[in-house]
Amino acid sequence: MSEVLSLEEKKKRIAELNKSFSKKYGESGMVRMGTEVMKVEPISTGILGLDLALGKPMPRGRAVSISGTESSCKTTTALTTIATEMKNNKEAFCYYADVEQALDTDYAESLGVDLSRLVVDSTSVGEEALTKLRDSIASGLYSIAVLDSTNAICASKQEESDITATEMAIRARLLATTYPQLINACGKTNTLLIVIEQIRKKVGVMFGNPESTTVGEAGKFFMTQRIMMRRQTKVEEEGGVAISNEVKCSVIKNKVAPPFRKCDLVCIYGKGFDKITDTANLAIDFDIVQDKGHSYKKGTPEEKKWKSKDEFIKYLSSNEDFYEEIRKATLEKYNNSDQTLIMQDDDDIDRKNAEKEKFEDLAVTSKDNSMISDGSDEFKEGE
């Protein structure tokens, strides 16, 4: 039978045990009770709607994956995050593993990325690219590291083999071996790793979601946050010229805030995400600006009115101080709100309300018929 210890005696023995670990293995990894707290420091994506959907923006020292269909602005999201970090931290350097060899540096610069502080590596051989990425993260010199993308990684065995040869899951096995090393390096150096993934459809799937990433299941478990991005519709000018995409972002995994939140964004070709429209939509959603049906209105401290949503957005874009005021008010309203209900689709909320009403109806019926008297009857889903 184990010895019964008092609280103070337990603290004393834990301190002695930690001291012995420190002597044997060094100070790395040990957290002292009541003296050190492992806090998660967020890095803003620079996209207000996505930051709010994430709850806490992308965390330093962790890995985040961005998956999605083609032209769903995955690379733009990563570059916008880099640009925001460089703007907020003038000493920040970032590393970009351009395995796809498709990075447009002019576009990156137009988004606000300082190319003099961006190191780009275009190695396509998997082992070499991942080794460089791991060592770059482990150096502690970079605030953000990006892998774009896992699907473009070509293992040396594939590169040397005949073009008709097939090797099952070679990329997935390579990444499954590398991910623990990358995550360990991120944690030690407080570096954010952004992994960009493409999605494919499984053959022969009759039920459930046929979509999957092509790098196996291992990566999903190492990610602190997973973002799924889908292109919805393209916006056209008069004459049928496409000028932007509407993109839906879904947070399908989140270890630092509630998951399954969503947001809708607009990405303008050649310019990046439309932050003005994003902020305007959020201000209306949070009732900072009231939708009166025939007009839009903001009350205190100074009343303002606009005849249409487009007029409100145009006013925001031409008044930087007012834009910052609206943005701060939206953030404040978000921080003081019930965050479990916001950033969800109306369909999600309607579905949950319907399920709640159905359960309440069942409970009332059961009570009227005296079917539930001692709790012995279990409610089974589907009955």
Where are these regions (language model features)?
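The Walker A/P-loop phosphate-binding site
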Residues: 3, 7-117, 134-138
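N-terminal cationic and glycine-rich segments that engage phosphates or anionic surfaces
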Residues: 16-19, 34, 158, 201-206, ...
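Short amphipathic alpha-helices and their capping/turn segments at secondary-structure boundaries
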Residues: 129-145, 182
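Phosphate-binding/switch region of NTP-binding enzymes
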Residues: 136, 168-286
